[in-house]
Amino acid sequence: MAKAHTAKMPNDQVLRWAASGVDGTRVLSTESLSRSDHRPSGTFRLRIEGPAARATDVVLKVPIPRWILNAMVITNARALQLAETHGLAAPRLIAADLDGRASGTVATLETFLSGSADLPPMVSAARLREAGAAVARVNAVVLESQADLPHRARPIAVDDRAAERRRGWMPTTPLLQQADERVRSHGVPGAASVFLHGDVWGGNMLWEDDRCVALIDWKTAGVGDPGVDLGSLRMQMALQYGQDAPAHVLEGWQRQAGRAATAVPYWDAVAALNTPTVMQGWPGFADDGSPLDAAAVTERRDAFLRTALDQLPTPIS
């Protein structure tokens, strides 16, 4: 059994910088917001004492060696600025120390938002449609690559699981190998470059009932085909809630976008290929809401991938 990780809290220099970012006097409490028990946290909720003894809650983000790179914290900050410019539902950037001179590390401070990112064991079609619509609002921003918001060819672009399998760094299966060959021979579809969240799943969405109030954690944001985000969300919902869920996500996305999504099977396959061969630790729920084990979640990934391959156009030889 893996040993649980004890969260390492930010040091005094970082906390002093954070307090000064909201004209506060001191940090009253620090809480890790990480969902992982086996990795250190790079995201913290701070309660800061401010003028007239009023407390302010904010979110601090810092890098973690060999996991959350400096560039990812900087990308998150740039994405939040862009989200605010376009009126998107996301935290607002309060302060950023992108060279680490003031805080001793790359660090950002953003607003703390209400809402829950907990994954419900059962989900309504309305919530799935709302999730699709939330992503479509981001993808409505036409955008070319720029500093700190690079082109993204797949979700969570810092990972490339398909390449790891090709190089023998991770075991593969006949299905994953066939899918990788099909996707590579298909070629990347052409589409307008848009703003991408880059890591869309239930844990990066804040909810009040069936209303998505914000997308959070933009550290792999960038630009590219909207299918990167849509395929990622469709796959995540298939993993969590079964093979009927992606259709509701697509319906919500298309209704919000006012148009049909393109190359859906291709981007579904790309998303499925950028997952570990065995889906250990990935959440999924049975129809009765009971949690699924890794084998069952892996089979859901494989079923989603098979459907994508069945719908992917076969190249003319």
What positions do the PLM features span?
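An alpha-helical support segment within catalytic cores of ATP-dependent transferases
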Residues: 10-25, 140-198, 300-317
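Conserved N-terminal boundary motif of the eukaryotic protein kinase catalytic domain
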Residues: 25-33
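ATP-binding pocket architecture of kinase catalytic cores
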Residues: 33-150
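Active-site acidic catalytic loop and adjacent metal/ATP-binding pocket
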Residues: 37-48, 54-55, 59, 93, ...
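Short, glycine/acidic-enriched loop or turn micro-motifs at the edges of active sites
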Residues: 64, 114, 200-202, 220, ...
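A glycine-centered beta->alpha junction motif in the catalytic cores
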Residues: 65, 109-121, 143, 163-164, ...
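Active-site activation/catalytic loop segments of kinase-like enzymes and analogous catalytic loops
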Residues: 227-259, 271-289
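ATP/Mg2+ or Mg2+-diphosphate-binding catalytic cores
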Residues: 244, 255, 277-317
